[in-house]
């Protein structure tokens, strides 16, 4: 997309609430209840995406098509996949899909080959028994997810992740490691991220304290600013390239995944890329009614902007996917947590929900009470594998049963009459049964998806992550917001820099602080020196 077409797009932009297609969509969504007798399962890149637990009607499907058409879905999707400028506030492409293409361009291929050779050499020399991965946000969550899901492949090599500026995190990240056989992987797109650089400095001190003469030889950098990393001291041969068109929350597909290759295997990276590429193809080619990311996005719009659900629960019924929750949390909330539309006006409908969750069955004993009987409730994405890898059939059978049962309970609910009958059948006196039955009522009709993976393979995980990426893109398109920037993150970082200088006594306290901030700056000044 050139600057002329970008200008044209902005000039022709219409806020969502002004579109007659949106009014028709709202009416159809409000009159499209969940039907427990209807089955809707979509096949996408080897995943089964069961959207039977969402409201549906032919009228809603037709209204969704009209809404996507007025938003020029097919053209904007092509721009995304072809490297056009879709991140309009920063004037960039969001071409992370090119990083997982089977036959990428020469520059991407070169970085892939460099990454592969680095891992091959480290493996052949049995070097770097400990990896400390330093990065935050998108430079951390995706790699952490992959390593914790598949990290069993390298029993002789350990990976630890440090993201937080809290020094306790860095102390724990280095504890017990041999500095002489530890590689520090620093991932930062700009190579100016405070948390990453400060933790990197601590790592250098730790290496020097162990008597290592050239500590920078133990550092690898992944960044879009190789010049800055080299100036910091990282040898050029150990700097891997990012591109400015790779957003942080999509950087898993880039050289940031070096730690995945070292801790797991390069086959894990290749498998995830292949699965994601298969989902890209599905997203590009499948009809709207059969397109899993599109249909999940439409349901998400209905649940948030029409039905008013303020949050989305992620419930992976696989312990290895514990880190999937914060990964999706960042992807959805950093992408869709916006209230300004593309033209600079305010979006007059609710946008991105709060995303939260934890693996089942732990979740059932933590917050499922709220999901079933709370006054608000939330849509739930259940994610589970058909086959397990532990070999304990009974454990997996019970896990699957719990996943299916929780979803069915949310869908079907329990009426007062059924609850009363249950109490009476248990031999309860009539008056007590009539009273207690009210406490056992489950509203039901609460939306959910069930995403079934064949098993937790790199291919399936890659497809799953791309499914959510494209879902988020479509939701941003419909709402008319840019899902590829994060100005809300930047604002706080600027304020933190100033306050840090005030706490250190380097500058006077800003008289423009609110009363509470001014009080705590005064109270905490000099704390870091004590």
Region locations from a protein language model:
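Extended, charge-enriched "interface" segments that sit outside catalytic cores
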Residues: 5-124, 129, 398-400, 404, ...
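Helicase-primase coupling helices
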Residues: 52, 350, 354-455
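Phosphate/oxyanion-binding active-site loops and adjacent basic polyanion-contact surfaces
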Residues: 104-115, 166, 195-199, 360-363
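Glycine-rich phosphate-binding loops that contact phosphosugars or nucleotide phosphates
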Residues: 117-286, 498-501
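Short glycine-rich or small-residue beta-strand-to-loop segments that form or flank ligand, phosphate
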Residues: 130-135, 184-190, 310-318, 354, ...
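Short, solvent-exposed amphipathic alpha-helical segments in soluble enzyme
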Residues: 146-151, 175-179, 200-203, 237, ...
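Active-site phosphate/pyrophosphate-binding segments
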Residues: 209-392, 444, 491-500, 504-530
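C-terminal accessory domains/tails appended to large, multi-domain proteins
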Residues: 430, 443-446, 453-479, 484, ...
């Amino acid at each position: 997309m050139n600057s002329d077409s970008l200008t044209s797009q902005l000039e022709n932009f219409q806020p969502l609430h002004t579109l007659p297609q949106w009014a028709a969509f709202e009416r159809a969504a409000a009159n499209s209840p969940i039907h427990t007798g209807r089955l809707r399962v979509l096949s996408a890149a080897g995943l089964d995406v069961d959207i039977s637990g969402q409201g549906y009607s032919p009228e809603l499907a037709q209204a969704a098509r009209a809404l996507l058409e007025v938003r020029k879905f097919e053209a904007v999707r092509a721009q995304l996949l072809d490297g056009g400028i879709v991140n309009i506030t920063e004037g960039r492409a969001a071409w992370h899909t090119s990083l997982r293409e089977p036959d990428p361009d020469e520059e991407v291929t070169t970085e892939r080959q460099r990454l592969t050779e680095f891992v091959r050499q480290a493996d052949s020399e049995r070097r770097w028994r400990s990896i400390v991965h330093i990065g935050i946000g998108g430079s951390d969550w995706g790699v952490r997810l992959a390593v914790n899901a598949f990290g069993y492949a390298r029993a002789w090599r350990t990976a630890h992740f440090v993201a937080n500026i809290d020094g306790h995190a860095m102390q724990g990240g280095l504890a017990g490691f041999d500095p002489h056989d530890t590689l520090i992987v620093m991932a930062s797109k700009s190579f100016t991220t405070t948390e990453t650089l400060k933790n990197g400095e601590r790592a250098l001190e730790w290496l020097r304290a162990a008597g290592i003469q050239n500590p920078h030889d133990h550092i690898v950098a992944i960044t879009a600013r190789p010049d800055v990393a080299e100036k910091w001291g990282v040898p050029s041969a150990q700097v891997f390239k990012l591109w400015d068109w790779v957003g942080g929350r999509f950087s898993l597909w880039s050289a940031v995944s070096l730690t995945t290759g070292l801790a797991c295997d390069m086959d894990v990276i290749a498998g995830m890329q292949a699965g994601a590429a298969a989902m890209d193809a599905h997203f590009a080619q499948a009809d709207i009614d059969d397109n899993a990311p599109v249909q999940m996005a439409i349901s998400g719009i209905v649940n948030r902007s029409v039905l008013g659900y303020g949050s989305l629960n992620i419930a992976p019924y696989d312990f290895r996917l514990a880190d999937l929750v914060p990964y999706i949390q960042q992807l959805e909330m950093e992408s869709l947590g916006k209230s300004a539309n593309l033209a600079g006006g305010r979006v007059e409908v609710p946008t991105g929900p709060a995303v939260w969750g934890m693996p089942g069955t732990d979740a059932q004993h933590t917050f499922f009470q709220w999901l079933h009987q709370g006054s608000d409730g939330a849509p739930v994405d259940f994610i589970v594998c058909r086959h397990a890898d532990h070999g304990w059939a009974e454990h997996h059978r019970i896990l699957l049963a719990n996943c299916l049962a929780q979803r069915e309970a949310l869908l079907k609910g329990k009426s007062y009459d059924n609850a009363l009958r249950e109490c009476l059948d248990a031999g309860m006196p009539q008056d007590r049964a009539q009273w207690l039955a009210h406490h056992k009522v489950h509203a039901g009709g609460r939306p959910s998806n069930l995403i079934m993976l064949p098993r937790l393979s790199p291919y399936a995980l890659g497809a799953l992550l791309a499914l959510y990426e494209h879902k988020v893109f479509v939701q941003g398109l419909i709402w008319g917001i840019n899902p590829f920037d994060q100005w809300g993150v930047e604002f706080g970082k600027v304020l933190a820099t100033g306050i840090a200088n005030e706490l250190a006594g380097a500058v006077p306290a800003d008289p423009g602080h609110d009363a509470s901030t001014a009080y705590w700056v005064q109270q905490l000044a000099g704390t870091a020196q004590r």
